[in-house]
Curated annotation (Swiss-Prot):
Disulfide bonds: none annotated. The keyword Lipid metabolism applies. This is Acetyl-coenzyme A carboxylase carboxyl transferase subunit beta. It comes from Agrobacterium fabrum (strain C58 / ATCC 33970) (Agrobacterium tumefaciens (strain C58)). Acetyl-CoA carboxylase is a heterohexamer composed of biotin carboxyl carrier protein (AccB), biotin carboxylase (AccC) and two subunits each of ACCase subunit alpha (AccA) and ACCase subunit beta (AccD).
Amino acid sequence: MNWITNYVRPRINSMLGRRPEVPENLWIKCPETGEMVFHKDLEDNKWVIPASGYHMKMPAKARLADLFDGGIYEALAQPKVAQDPLKFRDSKKYTDRLRDSRAKTEQEDTILAGVGLLKGLKIVAVVHEFQFMAGSLGIAAGEAIVKAFERAISERCPLVMFPASGGARMQEGILSLMQLPRTTVAVNMLKEAGMPYIVVLTNPTTGGVTASYAMLGDVHIAEPGAEICFAGKRVIEQTIREKLPEGFQTSEYLLEHGMVDMVIDRREIPDTLASMLKIMTKAPADNANAVVPLAASA
């Protein structure tokens, strides 16, 4: 098949005067430096620009595969919920937006969750797919998050959250906002069970997601250069009529002001998480999969 694909087909196309089929997005441009990077090199480097270290948005499926040992994990089923309960329409029907996002991402909604081993330690991981309607939090996403927390409680294992979101999904109105207290309750249930909850803040983490489960972790790790906020910089400046500091709302700024615990390069996150979780769960070095609950807080 390789001989036919690599030799015969190009010769036939050349004889017939056909142009070779070139896939789109072979080269990716760094938003920070303008550097062009071959897409395969970018994928191999975990969507981090090699020269500048700029962290591009990483697809949810790729992040889960990178996190778990050998890329092997059990994907949690997406809960079935009502579609477009408000019959919402702006410039486009909400149902059409859902259909387009599903075709683009090959996901039912923004949340992907899985159970697997991280350096031998069983964990539940929850990841936002930003390409699905800007990772917005709606009924389906909220239900998926709650189910993931319930699974972590039943398995008695830690949960790691990777938010990347523009906030609550406006097309679902108050039903979307209801997911903020629901997910907050789920976080509290995990903590009451004595299991660690670590949040890895990625670019961007904003709005209602920041106002709920994204800022309730036992430890908050942030990727370099990530925008982390509730309201955007422009909105705040227009409200207070003052210029905000340089780098305001970036992960580095939040680290300096005590809002996050550490800023870690994406390529180092799996090892960092594994080391941290083994300490937090008191997992024996010779049996990393044995999870001991944290002591209840006073």
